[in-house]
Amino acid sequence: LTRLGLNIHMTHNNINTEEVNCFGQDVKFELAAPNLWWVHNTFDDDTLKWMQSIYVNLDNKFEVTRPERRLLLADGADNRTLQEIGRMLVPSLEKMLDLKLNLMISKFWLDLPYFGCQPHGDSSEIIVTLQIYVDVKHIEDHQLRMYGAEFMHVDPLIEAPIIENCGYLNLNTDQKIHQVTWGCGTRQSVTFQYNLATDN
């Protein structure tokens, strides 16, 4: 995959970010199951640090979403940058998946303690979802730890790596059932959802 750059100068919480990039040079995709990949080392350090600062930037606002205990970044400068990053990822994803894609939406989620999500399948309109955990605060190896998305279309189910700068890429043509088990801690993630481009 090629590295795509998005040159933006931003100031947030007295931290200057000269450049926010898309996929970092060390990104790795590991096939976990049919049409599902674990993603490792997704973004470079500057981009990751910027993403980790979103929830402490006092210029940002969050909305309460359903299910409860999940906050969604509302519109603003950081949200607009996130949308642009989602668009800049398209060429690499198209090359990997051999599909023509259109960004539907980019999201930043802050999951609070005891957030969980019941088994569900994504809308058939969503063809590709890329979710990356940018920060996780919990006690590892504890029964009440935070969990990554758990995909239930294989037996036993498999869990996306709940590690900073890692996550999953889901080709949703088979509408996999997945869930999030609740735990104690907080979890920040960015999610990019794509549908098929109209010229497909």
Task: List PLM regions with ranges.
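General helical structural elements
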Residues: N7, L73-A74, T191
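Catalytic core of non-heme Fe(II) oxygenases with the double-stranded beta-helix
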Residues: S92-N200
